[in-house]
Swiss-Prot record:
Protein name per the record: Abscisic acid 8'-hydroxylase CYP707A1
Keyword Metal-binding appears in the UniProt entry: yes
Organism: Solanum lycopersicum (Tomato)
Enzyme class: oxidoreductase
Record localization: Membrane
Family membership: Belongs to the cytochrome P450 family.
Membrane-protein topology: Single-pass membrane protein
Predominant cellular place of this UniProt entry's protein: membrane
Cofactor: heme
Binding-site residues for heme, renumbered to this chain: 422
One GO CC term, this protein: membrane
SUPFAM superfamilies xref list: Cytochrome P450
């Protein structure tokens, strides 16, 4: 839930800061912006300093962006939390920023979020350092590596599902977060001691809760608690790293790739702080997004009984074959689930978990006759593109059959695009398919209440995390 007292406090602090800055320096800094004002995209900058922050936070953020696109077009300006922004809602513009001219737009995140994850994390950087990190991160997350994780992900899926049965009400999103966290731990560390894993989970959960709170570093605030938990996480990870260095053989995973990395092209091996920052960054990228997708799949299948039966039929054939031959899912089988795979793709489009990307112009950039000034934030709006009827007819309808043919280029970017596209997308798709396989072949469920409404934190999930009941079924 939104803490409006924290919002008021946060905005008040920034307004006071802005007024002080304006009276000291404002007059000297306005001339160049006024000179170029006629070139700026259309849009509204809202109130002084806070801009349209209140409008964004007081409504569905997707409605905020869609309404402004309808009013101003596919490129428009606004101001959020004191930052002037240019929003881009066309495939061509997204590709321009993320691929064609990516060197002109650097990744940008609020400093408060960098403090919680760690300033050396991969998605805060670009250039040679980013390329070096991406190579290390992708190695244990490529298809050749993750196929060996299938038995362990199956075990985690079945264990999670079994813990939900009995007819009690389950917060599906919270449970899926637990599952995706376990998969993330597996991909990073291999198998961790239970006590260490619990300490890691406890402190990570505190950081997670504070990540999307307003960054007020005062006693009792979620942000202060998150900063304290982040320090503890660093110590826990240092101890894990020390113990793993003492082992003669390291378990395969992201941490072992970091520890085994050699000096390359002027880059020294990563130090412990850099390793910790990137481990926490990967956990953040892996947990909430995958959990959100899985929660939406459960809702969409529940709301579309005929589609659910089609998915069940497809998965039952695989399940029966494996029962007869007494083995689990294989990599080849996960590549041959066309109906289920289209359900996943349509869920990624409909829910658009990653609604936009954050970039900042490193120089004045001209695009289609408009100026994007240096220092302005730039946000390609993936959700607006995914819900554009020009590319996806009847976009509010859940229709996996639309993916029987490939979408037009640059109209479907569920994992981002360019050099900063999600490096763990293959692992995410694999765990989603495995969980869905066991869900539909061994369990049934019902959503409690209407199941309507969306909450943002910041990723979109069904309101209340999708309350549901689960029961085990007898597969035949």
């Amino acid at each position: 839930m939104v803490n409006y007292f924290e919002i008021f406090l946060y905005i008040s602090m920034f307004v006071l800061g802005y007024l002080s800055y304006y009276f000291c320096f404002g007059k000297n800094n306005n001339s160049s912006s006024k000179k170029n004002a006629y070139k700026l995209p259309p849009g509204s900058m809202g109130w002084p300093y806070i801009g349209e922050t209140l409008q964004l936070y007081s409504q569905d953020p997707n409605a905020f962006f869609i309404n402004r696109q309808r009013r101003f077009g596919e490129i428009f300006k606004t101001k959020i939390l004191g930052c002037p922004c240019v929003m881009l809602a066309s495939p061509e513009a997204a590709r321009f920023v993320l691929v064609n001219q990516a060197n002109l737009f650097k990744p940008t995140y609020p400093k408060s979020k960098e403090n919680l994850i760690g300033q050396s994390a991969i998605f805060f950087h670009q250039g040679d350092y980013h390329n070096h990190l991406r190579k290390l991160v992708q190695a244990p997350l490529n298809p050749e590596s993750i196929r060996n994780q299938i038995p362990y992900i199956e075990e985690l899926s079945i264990s999670a599902l079994n813990s939900w049965v009995g007819g009690h009400v389950v917060n599906t999103y919270h449970e899926m977060k637990k599952f995706s966290f376990e998969v993330g731990i597996l991909a990073i560390f291999g198998h961790l001691d239970g006590h260490v894993k619990e300490e890691l989970k406890k402190n990570y959960s505190i950081v997670d809760k504070g990540y999307n709170s307003f960054p007020i570093n005062l006693p009792g605030t979620l942000y202060r608690k998150a900063l304290q938990a982040r320090k503890k996480l660093g110590k826990i990870l240092s101890e894990i790293i020390r113990e793993m260095k003492e082992k003669k053989t390291l378990e395969k995973g992201l941490l072992s790739c970091f520890l085994n990395a050699k000096e390359e092209k002027g880059f020294l091996v990563l130090n412990e702080d850099q390793i910790a920052d990137n481990i926490i960054g990967v956990l953040f990228a892996a947990q909430d997004t995958t959990a959100s997708v899985l929660t939406w799949i459960i809702k969409y299948l529940h709301d579309n009984p005929k589609l659910l039966e089609c998915v069940k039929a497809e998965q039952k054939v695989i399940w029966q074959s494996n029962e007869q031959e007494n083995h689990g899912l294989t990599w080849t089988q996960t590549r041959k689930m066309p109906i289920t795979s289209r359900v996943v793709l349509e869920t990624l489009r409909m829910a658009s978990i990653i609604s936009f990307a954050f970039r900042e112009a490193v120089a004045d950039v001209e695009y289609k006759g408009y100026l994007i000034p240096k220092g302005w934030k730039v946000m390609p709006l993936f959700r607006n593109i995914h819900h554009n009827p020009e590319f996806f007819p009847d976009p509010q309808k859940f229709d996996p059959s639309r993916f029987e043919n490939a979408p037009k280029p640059n109209t479907f970017m569920p994992f981002g695009s360019g050099v900063h596209a999600c490096p763990g997308n293959e692992l995410a798709k694999l765990e989603i398919l495995i969980m869905t396989h066991h869900l539909v072949t061994k369990f049934r469920w019902e959503v409690v209440g209407s199941g309507s409404g969306i909450q943002y934190g910041p990723f979109p999930v069904p309101l209340g995390g999708l309350a549901a009941r689960f029961w085990k079924t007898t597969s035949t």
